[in-house]
Each structure stands twice: as structure tokens, then as C-alpha cells.
Amino acid sequence: MDTHAFKRSLHHSDRYNRRGFGRAEEVAGSLEQAYQSSLIGSIRDNGYRLNHGRLQVRLAKDFGFCWGVERAVAMAYETRKHYPSERLWITNEIIHNPSVNDHLREMNVQFIPVEQGVKDFSGVTSGDVVILPAFGATVQEMQLLNERGCHIVDTTCPWVSKVWNTVEKHKKQTFTSIIHGKVKHEETLATSSFAGTYLVVLDLEEAQIVADYILGNGDRDSFMARFSKACSPGFDPDQDLEKLGVANQTTMLKRETEEIGRLFERTMLSKFGPTQLNEHFLAFNTICDATQERQDAMFSLVDEPLDLMVVIGGYNSSNTTHLQEIAINRGIRSFHIDTPERISADNSIEHKPLGQELIRELEFLPSGTVTVGITSGASTPDRVVEHVIQRLISLSEEN
């Protein structure tokens, strides 16, 4: 399928919208009430610091809603305003934040049901309005909705679209796309649908396995056993690793993505030499500015003397998980929560350690003067961060 031609055709359809409906002022009040916070604004103005009795709060200097998320949420609100009575669907969570998605449900936005890991579009009919979320949708889903006669509102983040353009460039030049991402993440699923031949690597360890295989140090059966669910149909590691381009899920750790890019550049240089490098490796620049800024701010925050860290965001939010990873790697006692209600008045906290299920921990806030670092993922509203801080203040006063 010529995905580039399909996108171009879709963008010219009168049933497709990716620019909103000119109703920004009409929804501004609702967005402000639901998501913004005067407390967070004052903390920003005070050098990202709040001192309250024995509690000292240190906010990361970049956190929370990025402009791509703000755009997607605003477009969803505009869509409901523009189509007040039409049946309105969204193909997935608009962003990875439970409170935002709950607000959409309250606006009678229906989420495409998922049965055994497969989306069920059987209830979607001609004339329905369907929102594509911030991290996009697969080209097959777009094609299905277009053929069904739906009105499509595309809130895909432009940074994600940039990655799609990158893998389409790889495909056009018959390069295999090495995608740094999580195989089942919605963004990576969408990106791979626009690619030709592709292989998804989770981290530097998996990238090293691929690099070793390219240089002749690997077993084909073992390789395919590991990557069989992370590659394009018919992928052949003996043929499809000769020409590589690198792309990434925009919410992955920036430093790791850069290391993976350098690893494959060195690998292809070693195999093919400097004169042929450009024929076998395509450099890339698909790292999202907002993701980079939040990670950089987190690295700065963990340099401060902190007693503990609270990271706020959806448990399925990749960028939030990576912020938690930064704190853990620095040896800081850190808690990933998705809602303020995870912090209880009895000084316990329900949180999700890296790679584990939810656990409850007692004696969350220590006695005496305590310095708490706080950050939040790109899908977390300031209002949610405010409510977390209010709970911390209450705990510091009562315990």
C-alpha cells in the first residue's frame, strides 16, 4: 500500500479534519476549569518551589501537558461542540491520563471496544465522527474509517507524524526501519503501519543483539525467536539488515535513542566502511522536543537533595515511565501514581514500581522536614498535580 498517497488523498477529503473547527474560545473555559491550576502557576512563579511547614516541594521545570497533548484535548472538546448530537467515537485513549479520558466519557465520547487485544469497529457506521488520538492510529484503521464514510478528526501530534514521514522515507529508499519503541504501544503500532520492512527494538540491549547479528555474531533461530513479534511480516534478518534507518517512538528515553542511533551507525561503518556508509545507514532526528525537555528537567531535578520523588501520569504512559526510570537510576525513593487518590490520609500510598504491579506502601511521607520532588508526564494536567500537592500538604500537617 502506498501510505503516502493514501494520506495525501485523505487530507483532501471533506470528511477529514486535522486543524480544529475554529471553536477554541468556546471551549477555553471548560479546558481551563478542568485542567489548569492557579497553585501550579504560583509555584512556577516562585522558582518551581513551595515551602509549607515541614514540607518542601520541588517541581521539575518542564512537566505536564505538552503542546501536542493540549492540541489533541482541545480538538476533542471542539469536536463535541461542533457535533453536539452526532455519535462520537475515539479509536483509543486521547492521551494516557485517566482523568482526561473520563472527562471525554462524560461528554458522551465512546471508546472503540477492544476484544482480546483487537479493536472492534463493528459499531461504527457511516456519518459517525471518529477522533484519532494524539499518538495516532494505524493506516489500516484510517482506511477502514474512510471507507465506512466516517468523519475523521485527526489529533495526531505533529511530532508523531514526523516519525511516520521518516519511516516512509526509509521505505521509499528500500531501507529497513529500526524503530526504538515498545512493540504494543499505540504509537509504535501506528508508526510501523506506515513503514515497509521494520524491526522494533525496546532498548540498547536489544539493539546490541541486532548489531551483533549484522556483524555475523548471532544465531538466526535465536534471533527470530526473540524478534518474531517485533518485525514486519516475512522479515529476513539475513537480507533485511543490510540497509538501515533509525526512528523512534517519540516518548522513549532521548539518550537511549541517541545511543541506539550511534550504535547502528558504528555497526554499518564497521561492516561496509566509510565510503559506503551513506548507502547503508540513514541518520535520523525524530526525538520529540517536549519529551526531551521533560527528561532534561528531570535530570536536573534529581541533582537536587530530595527525600523522595512523586511521578504523576498514566501507568500506560511511556514518557511518564521513563521519568520514573531517571529517578530510580539515581537511587531516589520514587513513586509513580496515576491519580491523587493513590495517596491516602493514613500516610500510605498505592503506586506502581517499574515493571511491577500496583503495591501499597505504608509510612509514605517521613517525619521531620521532607523535600519532595514532583514531575508529571506529558499527558498529566496541572490540576491533577495540584491535587497531589494538596494531599502532600495535608499529610505533612497531620502526620
UniProtKB/Swiss-Prot annotation:
The GO terms this record gives for MF are: 4 iron, 4 sulfur cluster binding; 4-hydroxy-3-methylbut-2-enyl diphosphate reductase activity; metal ion binding
Q: Where is the active site?
A: E187
Question: Quick one: which residues bind (2E)-4-hydroxy-3-methylbut-2-enyl diphosphate?
Answer: H96, H185, T250, S317, S318, N319, S379
- EC nos: 1.17.7.4
Which residues of the sequence carry a binding annotation for isopentenyl diphosphate? H96, H185, S317, S318, N319, S379
What InterPro entries does the entry give? LytB/IspH
Q: Which Pfam families match?
A: LYTB (PF02401)
Which superkingdom? Bacteria
Recite the UniProt keywords alphabetically.
4Fe-4S, Iron, Iron-sulfur, Isoprene biosynthesis, Metal-binding, Oxidoreductase
What cofactor(s) does the depicted protein rely on? [4Fe-4S] cluster
Q: What class of enzyme is it?
A: oxidoreductase
Q: In which pathway does it act?
A: Isoprenoid biosynthesis; dimethylallyl diphosphate biosynthesis; dimethylallyl diphosphate from (2E)-4-hydroxy-3-methylbutenyl diphosphate: step 1/1; Isoprenoid biosynthesis; isopentenyl diphosphate biosynthesis via DXP pathway; isopentenyl diphosphate from 1-deoxy-D-xylulose 5-phosphate: step 6/6
Co-factor binding comment: Binds 1 [4Fe-4S] cluster per subunit.
Q: Which reaction does it catalyse?
A: isopentenyl diphosphate + 2 oxidized [2Fe-2S]-[ferredoxin] + H2O = (2E)-4-hydroxy-3-methylbut-2-enyl diphosphate + 2 reduced [2Fe-2S]-[ferredoxin] + 2 H(+); dimethylallyl diphosphate + 2 oxidized [2Fe-2S]-[ferredoxin] + H2O = (2E)-4-hydroxy-3-methylbut-2-enyl diphosphate + 2 reduced [2Fe-2S]-[ferredoxin] + 2 H(+)
Q: Report residues binding dimethylallyl diphosphate.
A: H96, H185, S317, S318, N319, S379
- Which Gene Ontology BP terms does the record give? dimethylallyl diphosphate biosynthetic process; isopentenyl diphosphate biosynthetic process, methylerythritol 4-phosphate pathway; terpenoid biosynthetic process
Q: Which residues bind [4Fe-4S] cluster?
A: C66, C157, C288
What is its biological role?
Catalyzes the conversion of 1-hydroxy-2-methyl-2-(E)-butenyl 4-diphosphate (HMBPP) into a mixture of isopentenyl diphosphate (IPP) and dimethylallyl diphosphate (DMAPP). Acts in the terminal step of the DOXP/MEP pathway for isoprenoid precursor biosynthesis.
Q: Which family does it belong to?
A: Belongs to the IspH family.
- Protein's name according to its UniProt entry: 4-hydroxy-3-methylbut-2-enyl diphosphate reductase
- Native source species: Synechococcus sp. (strain WH7803)
